[in-house]
Amino acid sequence: MLDIKLKYKDIEIVNIEKENIEDIFYMMKSNENEVNVDYHPLTKVEELEDTFIEYYLSECEFFIKIMYRSYLVGLIKGRAEFKNPNEIWILYFLKNRYKLEDREWYNIIHNLEIYFFKQYGIDDFYVVVNNNNLNLINIFKKNGFSISRIYEKNKYDNINNNEIVLKKLRHVNRIKYYI
């Protein structure tokens, strides 16, 4: 597990702990959230506990909660790949659509990028987003992400559910981003 502790203004971004599992599960099942991918297979709290243990034992994965004034407003799960250049892959991004405005989410993403660079030397960032989730796509695009590729998924109920990989390659313009 990558250890993450970031606090600024009224935002705190920290690792999920075992005692958070039940609250996290019910947040994931709530319809007040916006998620980067439409499909989440968990149906029981015990399945999330298994996911938690897997992340906890892995040295390159992270599963973090985003708190705003002590309210749980978001979750991010992903992994780091340490190669040249180092990368972060955000595989699950959930945000409460009512607690924070989009501009605050821009700041959260930006501050996480800086944190990952300073703590772990991460230069490049990738996120997978469902092509129908235009709001999340725009949040990441306004943060300097661009479309890298599109994965065509099987149609479900005649709806195209392709996944888009957005990327931000900071190693190309490192001086621009960190000064």
Give residue spans per PLM region.
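Short acidic N-proximal helix/loop "leader" segments that mark the beginning
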Residues: M1-Y8
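Acetyl-CoA-dependent GNAT
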Residues: K18, K29-E32, P41-L100
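Alpha-helical elements of Rossmann-like donor-binding domains used by nucleotide-donor carbohydrate transfer enzymes
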Residues: D23-Y26, E47-T51, N107, N111-Y115
